[in-house]
A protein has these predicted regions:
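Catalytic cores of alpha/beta
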Residues: 1-11, 27-28, 45-58, 99, ...
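Glycine-rich phosphate-binding active-site loops on the catalytic face of alpha/beta enzymes
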Residues: 11-30, 61-78, 114-147
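Histidine/lysine/aspartate-rich catalytic loop segments that bind and position anionic ligands
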Residues: 40-84, 95
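Alpha-helix-loop-beta-strand connector modules within alpha/beta enzyme cores
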Residues: 20, 27-44, 80-111, 144-159
Length: 166
């Protein structure tokens, strides 16, 4: 609905990220076109099997997480004990190895996590509170990107080239 409303107002929409239970990625692709970026959350108990078997023909990347418990991802899932399911760096590395599309990680990601996260083989990260709750949000964003660039061993060049400049 938001995409259609934005497009009706003449606003350029470069992409969308959807959850597994949101609007189907095929519908997103139909409305946004082949040049758009479409991401899909990969948050299941059987994440490894899901990533190996899901149809990725309509998506550009998987969003994986959370790395840490965070208020911005209250619906990310809980285990049988009611504890929020988070992903370890080891799990994230395995996901990056088996995924047929680029992987980005989010959910509680902080600057201190970036060096280790960059070494997992994922293609990027996404944050909310690390920037929005910072005393200087612009500097926080700059620090995150600089640190990533310093430590990253893998990067999705095609996705970066499509990235919208802020």
């Amino acid at each position: 609905d938001v995409i259609l409303a934005a497009k009706q107002q003449g606003i350029k929409v470069d992409g969308i990220h959807v959850g597994q239970d949101d609007i189907p990625v095929e519908v997103c692709r139909e409305y946004l076109g082949e040049d758009s970026i479409i991401g899909l959350s990969a948050r299941t108990h059987d994440i490894f099997e899901y990533i190996k078997t899901v149809d990725v023909s309509q998506i550009d990347y998987f969003g994986v997480g959370p790395l840490h418990e965070t208020m911005t991802k209250p619906d990310c899932g809980v285990d049988l004990d009611g504890k929020v399911i988070t992903r370890s760096f080891e799990e994230i590395s395995k996901i990056a190895q088996i995924s047929p599309v680029p992987v980005v990680v989010g959910g509680g990601v902080k600057l201190i996590d970036i060096p280790q996260l960059a070494q997992t083989g994922v293609d990027g990260f996404f944050v909310v509170s690390s920037v929005s709750e910072a005393d200087d949000p612009k500097q926080a964003a700059v620090d995150l990107v600089k640190t990533w660039k310093l430590y990253a061993t893998v990067g999705c060049k095609d996705l970066i080239e499509k990235q919208v400049k802020l």
